[in-house]
Amino acid sequence: MAGFGLPNFGQLTEAFKKAQQIQQNAQKLQEELEVMEIEGTNDDNRAKIWMSGNQKPLRVEIDPSLLSEGKAIIEEAILEAMKSAHEVSTSTMKERMEDLTGGFKLNLPGMGEES
């Protein structure tokens, strides 16, 4: 009756060590993502948005020439830059998480492939 179908103690200990290492690396990654500055721009680079690796908005820069374009064009330029920064920030976070977990499929909300 040895084992009772349970993994051996060595395997269990190794699994806990790996989990602790991932947890420590995740904390380090969280800190790295927080201080990252990722730039997104609109098509003509006259609107720029910077976000952290955690998608936290950091700052906005508008080229003075854009200010004479009118409200709708300015809004569209800012929106394009926001989308660009968010896309790069999200893909950076996803890549870093995959590196951290060694490719384990975690199925984190918002991190999966779009349907």
From Swiss-Prot:
Protein localization: Cytoplasm, Nucleoid
Keyword Nucleotide-binding: no
Subunit structure: Homodimer.
GO MF assignments: DNA binding
UniProt organism field: Prochlorococcus marinus (strain NATL1A)
Disordered, as annotated region: 89-115
Key words of the record: Cytoplasm, DNA-binding
Pfam families: YbaB_DNA_bd
HAMAP family reported for this sequence: DNA_YbaB_EbfC
Annotated NCBIfam families: DNA_YbaB_EbfC
Protein name: Nucleoid-associated protein NATL1_00191
Superkingdom: Bacteria
